[in-house]
Amino acid sequence: MIKIKKGLDLPISGAPEQTITDGKPVRHVALIGFDYHGMKPTMAVKEGDRVKRGTLLFTDKKTEGVRYTSPAAGVVKEINRGERRVFQSVVIEIDGDDAETYARYSDSDLAGLERQQVVDNLVESGLWTAFRTRPYSKVPEIDSAPNSIFVSVMDTNPLAADPTVIIGENSKAFEKGLT
């Protein structure tokens, strides 16, 4: 076993150009089971089903009520399972940009929202799965209340992009998301 105490500084000279450019169009997206520690899915779709962005793909048997939704509209191409039927991925071939609709709130309403309204909206839309508990990085229970929330915007990988460039013109929306 290799143990690193102080990390590794790569001797890379220069810095990346801090611009955002369009990449090649993506044709397939997937939800990867490995990204969600301890999750046991109950599938709500099967191969060949057409889904919208935000459509329920599966729920977690271990974390009641947590919904995992489609990141894009299209057709479910594959549901991959490994040994002992361990969930590996759901692959969606992108086709169109249909999306489910969820409650939207105006800027003036944000400060007055009840906690339960926010939780319900996050769970229904599938965005609740973006939260992680510490130290095991699992998706939290819906009825749990955190002591604190950490928002990580700094990528520590070598030559990572500057977060101010990424947030850029959406800084107001970023700030509203933190309220």
Please identify what each model-predicted range represents.
Residues 41, 47, 64-67:
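Short, conserved secondary-structure segments in the cores of folded domains
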Residues 56-65, 83:
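Short, charged beta-turn/beta-strand-edge "cap" motif at the junction between a beta-strand
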Residues 27-29, 41-43, 75, 88-90, ...:
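Structural beta-strand/beta-sheet cores of well-ordered domains, especially the beta-sheet scaffolds
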Residues 80-179:
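Buried, small/hydrophobic-residue-enriched core segments of structured protein domains
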Residues 49-52, 72, 172-176:
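Short alpha-helical basic/polar micro-motif
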Residues 46-59, 78:
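Short, well-structured beta-strand-loop connectors
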Residues 65-81:
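Short, compositionally biased
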